[in-house]
């Protein structure tokens, strides 16, 4: 409709997006585990795969994706970000981490996150302090980083020969 304006809330642009993509990532990891078992490949080979020496391996890509999902929803809602040990060493453990993250993110309701567009968000990245307003944090920092790490995890597994495709990444529509 010409001239119509679409309204998208902070909640709609965050929690359901994280939930959908994390569910897709969990399914991709399940396929990767089956692939490794079928071919008698030690799963640590896939979990430690990286594209370049200075890039994180698959395990860390998944950990960072879950960190962005839980951290973003928590910060937008103004609650503490849960800390995870980052000690996953199997596909099953990574899927457990995703499940724990899904439980956390799914607990938020629209009222918890909506209205956070102007919330002050401060992060520490190495020795730098990053300051954002909620909407800029979500749209220009958190979502791009989340998608980067989910996509990199997908690409690493695809490059290793795991039989996954675009619909595995996108998921059910």
In which residue ranges do the predicted regions lie?
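Short, Lys/Arg-enriched N-terminal segments with co-localized hydrophobic residues
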Residues: 1-5
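Alpha-helical scaffold segments that form or flank carboxylate-/histidine-based iron centers
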Residues: 7-20, 42-65, 85-94, 126-145, ...
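Structural signal for well-ordered, non-membrane alpha-helices
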Residues: 22, 26-33, 70-73, 99-106, ...
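Residue-level detector of short coil/turn "hinge" positions at structural boundaries
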Residues: 36, 43, 112, 164-166
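Conserved, structured C-terminal
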Residues: 36-41, 81, 125
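Conserved alpha-helical segments that form or flank metal/cofactor-binding pockets of metalloenzymes
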Residues: 54-81, 101, 106-108
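Acidic/histidine-rich alpha-helical segments that form the ligand environment
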Residues: 86-157
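C-terminal end-helix/capping segment
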Residues: 158-173
């Amino acid at each position: 409709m010409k001239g119509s304006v679409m309204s998208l809330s902070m909640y709609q642009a965050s929690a359901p997006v994280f939930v959908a993509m994390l569910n897709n990532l969990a399914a991709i990891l399940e396929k990767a585990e089956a692939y490794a078992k079928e071919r008698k490949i030690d799963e640590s080979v896939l979990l430690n795969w990286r594209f370049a020496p200075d890039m994180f391996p698959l395990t860390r890509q998944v950990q960072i994706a879950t960190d962005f999902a839980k951290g973003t929803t928590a910060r937008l809602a103004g609650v503490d970000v849960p800390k995870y040990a980052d000690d996953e060493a199997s596909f099953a453990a990574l899927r457990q981490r995703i499940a724990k993250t899904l439980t956390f993110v799914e607990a938020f309701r629209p009222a918890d996150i909506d209205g956070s567009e102007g919330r002050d968000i401060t992060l520490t990245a190495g020795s730098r302090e990053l300051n954002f307003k909620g909407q800029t944090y979500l749209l220009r920092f958190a979502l791009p980083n989340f998608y980067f790490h989910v996509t990199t995890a997908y690409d690493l597994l695809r490059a290793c020969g795991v039989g996954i495709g675009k619909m595995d990444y996108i998921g059910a529509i």
